[in-house]
């Protein structure tokens, strides 16, 4: 996947992830808007966010370099990426990361099943949920019946 995504997009999504981890919706929403305005596909951005939360999951264990190298092989990343994410993962509990996975998964399913009116709106709502905005929990939409088209 890394070869399909240019470095600028990854860098911007990293900034988006940092804003989400800080629960800073005022920074996260404009970053997402910029990424979408640049023509990035919501599914691609969702995949990158998921990948970054996977790295955060491993980084949250505060690994030493040897352990980070083993972890990196398991997720096809680099030990450097895991070590860089360690500082951002310090304030996150495993439950926070699990909750983020649930939100990202709900967004993905809502897009793929047609429950989302627009992919962009679904992704924005997901980012807002990840930032802790009340009422933005996209998992609730999975409990509803799919719209008839």
Where are these regions (language model features)?
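Amphipathic alpha-helical interaction/assembly segments
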Residues: 37-59, 96-149
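Small-residue-rich helix-loop
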Residues: 1-99, 134-135
């Amino acid at each position: 996947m890394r070869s399909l995504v240019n470095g600028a997009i990854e860098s911007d999504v990293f900034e988006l992830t940092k804003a989400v981890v800080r629960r800073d919706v005022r920074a996260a929403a404009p970053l997402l808007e910029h990424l979408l305005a640049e023509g990035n596909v919501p599914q691609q951005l969702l995949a990158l966010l998921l990948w970054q939360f996977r790295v955060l999951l491993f980084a949250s264990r505060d690994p030493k370099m040897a352990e980070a190298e083993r972890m990196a092989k398991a997720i096809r990343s680099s030990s450097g990426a895991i070590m860089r994410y360690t500082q951002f993962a310090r304030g996150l509990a495993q439950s926070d990361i699990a909750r983020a996975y649930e939100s990202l998964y709900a967004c993905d399913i809502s897009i793929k099943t047609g429950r989302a009116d627009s992919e962009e709106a679904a992704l924005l709502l997901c980012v807002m949920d990840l930032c802790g905005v009340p009422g933005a929990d996209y998992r609730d939409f999975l409990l509803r019946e799919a719209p008839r088209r």
